Amino acid sequence: MKLLSNEKPTTTKKSIPEIHVVGTVGLEDQPLLAAHPESVMPSVDVDASTHLSVDDLRGPALLHRRTVLAGLAGAGTALLAPQLTGCAGAGVATRSATLPGSIAEAARGLRARSYSCEELTRAYLRAIDELQPRLNAFITVTGQQALDQARRLDAELRAGKDRGPLHGIPIVHKDLYDTQGVRTTVGSEFFKDRIPNADATVVTRMAQAGVVSLGKTHMNEFAAGISGTNAFFGDAHNPWDLARSPGGSSSGTGAAIAAGLCLGGTGSDTGGSIRVPASWNNITGIRPTFGRVSLRGVYPRAYSLDVAGPLGRSVADVAMLLQAMVGHDPPTRIR
């Protein structure tokens, strides 16, 4: 992850509003995969000379992507989780290693009945509940709605209906994608109570692909900037080092994926708002070709430059997310 500055992000002294949680969710302890240890994140043999320690994550090795990739031996950054868990003193925040490390791994577990969509969703909600106070990656958590979605998707799998590789996969949406019945603030106090009456086209397409939406993520106000700061909702923090910025403007999506609070998410990019969080959080993102993904229901920053796109833990994950997002809107006719 390459950082542009060694300076700590500026934090606002203004009081931060409490995170908005839609519905009451019981986050009782339900150890995911307890009965299926073989489905837990696989171990990877890494040569001792290239193995990364927690100290490496805060040192020069973190600044060189090739070093990171060599240390992971192609395994993906999720495999660092066992080293990071419980390292609060080092300023690091990440989820438990018992959660799937990729969309493909989660999809295999769901189809093998190692766990249900509801169990997977509940596990991620537990992780959010634990790490949100430190990361500030979310503006709104849609816990009850997510569990309801997951139960419906479980019923479909039992009935033999499989929507594809994203069926039951927990993801997040940047808070400038309209979501019916769930507030969309665009990161601004001005829109803090705005509730759209329809989903953005991308939100609809991803729901049709079977994703479970865990909530709406932090962003720079009106997608203006790459700092991850927000005067009203407070600053987001980088899970690799809580004293640093996760980048922006898709700051919450980047931080949530890197911390293992979801398996992927949506962002938008006008001048770097997908690419910067992907780089600063050491995850993967893509800025699709202009017009490849619908912008209907996505709050505009600059009509001629805005692009909607996905972020994920790996190229494979991002490819699956992008496949669900792509598609043109019907042409507009001027009468």
Describe the function of each predicted region.
Residues 1-63:
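N-terminal secretory signal peptides
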Residues 59-69, 82:
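Twin-arginine (Tat) signal peptide motif
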Residues 63, 101, 112, 251, ...:
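Residue-level signal for the nucleotide or nucleotide-sugar donor/cofactor binding architecture
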Residues 72, 76-81, 91-270:
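Gly/Ser-rich catalytic/binding loops embedded in alpha/beta enzyme cores
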Residues 88-91, 162, 287-335:
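A short helix-breaking turn/cap at a secondary-structure junction
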Residues 184, 224-228, 275-280, 298:
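Short acidic, glycine/serine/threonine-rich loops at helix termini
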Residues 270-296:
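Glycine/threonine-rich beta-strand-loop-alpha-helix active-site module
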